[in-house]
Amino acid sequence: LQFKLLREDIQVESVETYDLSSSKQTVSYVRIKNFQIDTSRELRNKLGSLNMVDGVILDLRNNPGGLLEEAIRVSDLFLPGKKRIVSTKGTVVSSVHDAKQLFAGDHLLNIPLVLLINRGSASAAEIVAAALKQNERAIVIGEQSFGKGTVQTLWDLKDGSGLKLTIGE
């Protein structure tokens, strides 16, 4: 038997949303599975019509993390400008990231926000949880998170493999 396979890009959404409604109020439930390229844009697009909701539940349970930049952008959606999101300390590079209001509009800044975490919430998910809690923007509910608190980068090697290196904490 011979097969001819065609390789295609598979787009996996990192954000799921749906509304929880009662006769008195509507709350949007948002699950972020991981922080990959465009997670913040995907979240913003899905929450674009929040005028009719009374609150948001942001579920980061079992979220292993992902891209630091996307964690910063997701946090930025819910924080007014000049609020500290994260600062990293590395042996080579240290940096500070404050909210910049990267996306137009402020409808997400005043909506009540509850954040869910558990022991499976790590890395970028912990950064979002800490930023929103420390800036008194969200109530965090759940278990202690994984406790990773590190920033890693992936280096592509010539043989097609990769090396994941911790570059900050």
Annotated model-derived regions:
Residues L1-K158:
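Cleft-lining beta-strand/loop regions that shape enzyme active-site pockets
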Residues L154-W155, L165-E169:
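Extracytoplasmic/periplasmic membrane-proximal domains and adjacent transmembrane bundles
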